[in-house]
Structures are given as C-alpha cells and as structure tokens.
Amino acid sequence: MRKKITSVALVLMTVLILVSCKNTKQKLQEYVVTYNKTIAPSFRAENVTLTTARGYINDDKIELRFETDLEQNEANKSEADISFPKLIKLMIDKDQVPRQLIEEGVQFDVYFLADDNTVLDKEVLTGESLKDFLK
C-alpha cells in the first residue's frame, strides 16, 4: 500500500513539474513580449532611436533591430563594427539578451540599422558565437 501511494505521489509530482516548466518556444514568445513592452521603451544607447524584437517560433529565432540616427557611410559602418558588439555584450551581461535562450538553441539575429534602415552591422548570436561575445 505504501509503495502504491509513493508511486502515485511521484507520478503527480512529475506531472506538476512538467506542466510548470516552459518549453523554449514559450520562453521565446515571452521574451519578445517582455522586450517590446519593458526593455525597448526604456532602452538608451548612443545613436539608437528605437529597438524592437520579433520572434520566429518555427525557426527558433529572435530578431532584434536597433534603429539609429546614423547615416549609411563607411565611417559609421566602421564605428558600428566596433561599438555594436560592445553593446550586445553589455545587453548579455544585463540579461537583456538571455544566455539561457541562446544556450537552448535560440538564434538571435541582431541588426544595427542606419537612419534609412539599411544595415550598418549584423551579428548572429548562437551557442558558438556567444563564447566570443563573452570574452
């Protein structure tokens, strides 16, 4: 009898744990909503005028866009190549870009855009590239 009660309790605990755990796709959706409602409105960085997130659930991918007031030219492109990775590292350190999602296989495509919405710099964050950003 005691063995049966223990077995039933163990099964119930396992079910509760599984129900309460969120899968990666749910975390991805939750992050995008949180980013757009909480992080983006108060986000401040030099030359950044707007930032948004988009989630692509079927591809396990999140796109972060940083619109700037910079013109598209070689000088700004060169500066973006240096400053943008630093900004991303800072965001990872502040958990504004969550390591856990990247480690679970979510890819972050991060765009630094000129004032005409052309790409000044693009970084792709994966489990492998995350190591480079954290150096």
Placement of each model-derived feature along the sequence:
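Post-signal peptide N-terminal segment of mature Sec-exported envelope proteins
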Residues: 30-51
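A short amphipathic beta-strand at an alpha->beta junction
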Residues: 91-120
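Bacterial N-terminal signal peptides that target proteins for export
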Residues: 1-9
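C-terminal partner/receptor-binding element of secreted or periplasmic proteins
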Residues: 112-135
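Short edge beta-strands and adjacent turn/loop segments
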Residues: 45-70
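C-terminal motif of bacterial Sec signal peptides marking the signal peptidase cleavage site
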Residues: 17-20
